[in-house]
Amino acid sequence: MKVILRKDVAALGDAGEVVAVKNGYANNFLIPQGMATRATEGTLRALETEKKQQAKKMELKRKSARDLAARIEQMALKVQAKAGESGKLFGTVTAADIAEVLKAQGVEIDRRKITMEAPVKTLGKYEAEVKLFSDVVVRVSFEVEAEGVEA
């Protein structure tokens, strides 16, 4: 019997796939558990239209992520932090600090999408990666300045 998986099932496939399984397995386990539905002509057509709609949504998200990446690349970010006389910071500049600076510029990004190669503990210029979409990653440059010092 052919079924359409509603959820990811180990050793069978991912949600949305059409797979062939034995009748007993489908009728006694997959369908009652809500893991699959019978693959009829109507459900297959509905699956195809749903896949097309999701592809359109993903393309729109990808396009907006690319536009946002272009905006972020143009930004000159400055992070203010408390520092000693030698230029060493009291603490570190984290992804949350960069997310806060981006938010002040009008771009709201979750701090978990920002990665830095190493902790920033001194004044200077640095780069971080921002993952906006599965295949859209932008490098953002930022400068760490001592708090209260105007450039």
Swiss-Prot record:
GO terms for biological process: translation. The gene is rplI. This is Large ribosomal subunit protein bL9. One of its GO terms (cellular component) is ribonucleoprotein complex. The keyword rRNA-binding applies. GO terms for molecular function: rRNA binding; structural constituent of ribosome. The lineage of its organism: Bacteria, Pseudomonadati, Chlorobiota, Chlorobiia, Chlorobiales. Keywords: Ribonucleoprotein, Ribosomal protein, RNA-binding, rRNA-binding. It holds the Pfam family Ribosomal_L9_C. The keyword DNA-binding does not apply. Belongs to the bacterial ribosomal protein bL9 family. Binds to the 23S rRNA. Disulfide bonds: none annotated.
